[in-house]
Curated annotation (Swiss-Prot):
EC nos: 4.2.1.9
Ligand binding (Mg(2+)): 81, 123-124, 491
Keywords: 2Fe-2S, Amino-acid biosynthesis, Branched-chain amino acid biosynthesis, Iron, Iron-sulfur, Lyase, Magnesium, Metal-binding
Origin species: Buchnera aphidicola subsp. Schlechtendalia chinensis
Any GO molecular function: dihydroxy-acid dehydratase activity
HAMAP family linked to this entry: IlvD
Name of this protein: Dihydroxy-acid dehydratase
Family from the record: Belongs to the IlvD/Edd family.
The reaction(s) this protein catalyses: (2R)-2,3-dihydroxy-3-methylbutanoate = 3-methyl-2-oxobutanoate + H2O; (2R,3R)-2,3-dihydroxy-3-methylpentanoate = (S)-3-methyl-2-oxopentanoate + H2O
GO biological process: isoleucine biosynthetic process; L-valine biosynthetic process
GO cellular component term of the entry, any: cytosol
Residue numbers annotated as active site: 517 (proton acceptor)
Gene name, Swiss-Prot/TrEMBL: ilvD
Length: 613
């Protein structure tokens, strides 16, 4: 039976100093026989997805105390990718994932906490916390702040749903009036919570639920809804329960690595592919697998993408459905149930409640359940009032979306496509692979041939798009924006959104060793590996080269001879110390980013740091 980790600092006469300090934080002698549970929060006033988390940490702490534990809260950093987007701030987003994971390890191990409950929500915070949980492998429960309600606006007498991406598109398109652009901006993000589409934040929170590390409903239940309060209360109770079971009964089944097995990773990735979720999830799942020592690689994702159907399209892949609609249709479990009906899931998995997949589906699948509490939870919907305060409304949909033919979630027989919403491409441009969100690509663009127009920075590409230098038939190549080359692997939401605002999104492709926001749609191919800074062939592309993209065949190739490839490679190497670095880009790189670049791997390895010790 494992000893409580916290006993290192709370037991024995020699730890009088540590106990004195604990007592200064409010602990008493009676607390030293209780589990110390870290409340790992990520509250910040910078991020709408985290603006409401301060009081939620207090709520969870109070529940832990009532259940017989000692709660100790600390905060991680949290970057808002939307605010950091389109300027040098985006260089810091992905590296912050590693800092979050490291800072949690530092706090947990330095203070010998017994367990932790992670309160996350947005893009790099959830994966950073997941990496830490799998690294530390102590009892852990995840509960996120919840999705934002979609924005609503009346245009030409018709109410439409909007989100952050619409604000960017309307703001960049000179054909829209200032008044309309301002109205969109003011209505796009109406409440606290993670942006209302299936962007990276909501994708990761859904995958946390699919992995089994959070309670059912965690990925889709709105931040503003009163039902989400119960999710936090139940999570607080659960972390105390499983902590005691581990330390007092030697029950290891609730540890993160016991739950997030290879089979769980395959199920989570299957869910992601079936939704056409953010391509960033691939990056994060690969990184998490390495932390948890799980055998899960890019090749597994490639195989899954060829057999998992695309059963669900949510903004930005849909103009109709947002997270609130996904929840109404049964959410994560509703979609898993459709995959399970055609035997596309691994059933040998359990979740944080200790329930098997079959039991979870029987209880929480809205097409099967008789449980009135479950049915009531999935009726939770948006009220439509602006607020940054959680749990302020109790609106219920009048009915659930059980339409599996044309509804938000479709059955296998009514799939959008049968080869999934995400795909891995290989070729002489990307020998180790690259990623495309096929759910966001129009059918006419699944096979595309175009002429390269090459840029060595996102900023340079943005300028060219807005100055009408990018034309129909171009393949926009943005290189030296990978984990090492950026450094930091910037998201390319602005280039893809500007292409859309210029009505070029269906007539151009964009390829990069950088990555894309979950809000990206169109023929946007990222994570090209090896990246340019790691001697990848994307560094050898020149203006007007012909590039062939064939998504059905999973290929991406530069149409030049092998001799020409070798010649270009020779010329690049001749640049000496400057080889495989940008020739024309001027960018300040701080010491913090230089440190990240020194150890960063390419995207096919999850952009984790490779450290030899």
């Amino acid at each position: 039976m494992p000893k409580y980790r916290s006993s290192t600092t709370t037991q024995g006469r020699n730890m009088a100093g540590a106990r004195a300090l604990w007592k200064a934080t409010g602990m008493t002698d009676s607390d030293f026989n209780k589990p110390i549970i870290a409340v790992v929060n990520s509250f910040t006033e910078f991020v709408p997805g985290h603006i409401h988390l301060k009081e939620l940490g207090t709520l969870v702490s109070s529940i832990i105390k009532l259940e017989g534990g000692v709660a100790k809260e600390f905060n991680t950093i949290a970057i808002d990718d939307g605010i950091a987007m389109g300027h040098s701030g985006m260089l810091y987003s992905l590296p912050s994932r590693e800092l979050i994971a490291d800072s949690i390890e530092y706090m947990i191990n330095a203070h010998c906490a017994d367990a932790m409950i992670c309160i996350s929500n947005c893009d790099k915070i959830t994966p950073g916390m997941l990496m830490a949980a799998l690294r530390l492998n102590i009892p852990c429960v995840f509960v996120s702040g919840g999705p934002m309600e979609s924005g609503r606006i009346v245009v030409d007498g018709k109410e439409i749903k909007i989100n952050l991406v619409d604000a960017i598109v309307y703001g960049a398109n000179p054909n829209y009036s200032d008044a309309l652009a301002s109205r969109i901006e003011n209505c796009a993000c109406p409440t606290c919570g993670s942006c209302s589409g299936l962007f990276t934040a909501n994708s990761m929170n859904c995958l946390t639920e699919a992995l089994g590390l959070s309670l059912p409903g965690n990925g889709t239940l709105l931040a503003t809804h009163i039902d989400r309060k119960k999710l936090f209360i139940d999570s607080g109770k659960l972390i105390v329960k499983i902590t005691k079971e581990y330390y007092e009964d030697n029950n290891t089944s609730f540890l993160p690595r016991s739950i997030a097995s290879r089979e769980s990773f395959l199920n989570a990735m299957s869910l992601d592919i079936s939704t056409g979720g953010s391509t960033n999830t691939i990056l994060h799942l690969l990184a998490m697998a390495q932390e948890g020592q799980v055998d899960f690689k890019m090749s597994d994702i490639d195989l899954l993408s060829r057999k998992i159907p695309n059963l669900c399209k949510i903004a930005p892949n849909s103009d109709v459905y947002h997270m609130e609609d996904f929840h109404r249709a049964g959410g994560v479990i509703g979609l898993l149930a459709e995959l399970n009906r055609v035997s596309l899931l691994n059933n040998n998995v359990k979740n944080i409640l200790g329930l098997s997949l079959d039991v979870v589906l029987n209880k929480y699948d809205i097409l099967k359940t008789k449980n009135q509490d479950v049915i009531e939870m999935f009726h939770a919907g948006p009220l439509g009032n602006k607020t940054s305060i959680p749990f302020t409304q109790s609106y219920r949909w009048k009915s659930l979306d059980k339409d599996r033919k044309k509804g938000c979630i479709r059955s296998y027989e009514n799939a959008f496509s049968y080869d999934g919403g995400l795909a891995i491409l290989y070729g002489n441009i990307a020998k180790n692979g690259c990623v495309v969100k096929t759910a966001g690509v129009k059918k006419g663009n699944l096979i595309f041939e175009g002429f390269a127009i090459v840029f060595e920075s996102q900023e340079e590409a943005l300028k060219a798009i807005l100055e009408n230098k990018v034309k129909k038939g171009h393949v926009v190549v943005i290189r030296y924006e990978g984990p090492k080359g950026g450094p930091g692997m910037q998201e390319m939401l602005y280039p893809t959104t500007y292409l859309k605002s210029m009505n070029l999104d269906e007539h151009c492709a964009l390829i990069t060793d950088g990555r894309f926001s979950g809000g990206t749609s169109g023929l946007s191919i990222g994570h090209i590996s090896p990246e340019a800074a790691n001697k990848g062939n994307i560094a050898l592309i020149r203006n007007n080269d012909v590039i062939n993209i064939n998504i059905p065949n999973r290929t991406i190739n530069l149409d030049i001879t092998n001799d020409e490839f070798l010649n270009r490679m020779h010329n690049e190497i001749q640049r000496g110390k400057s080889s495989y670095t940008p020739q024309f880009r001027k960018r300040f790189v701080s010491s913090a980013l230089k440190m990240y670049a020194l150890f960063a791997t390419s995207a096919d390895k999850g952009a984790v740091r490779k450290i030899q010790y």
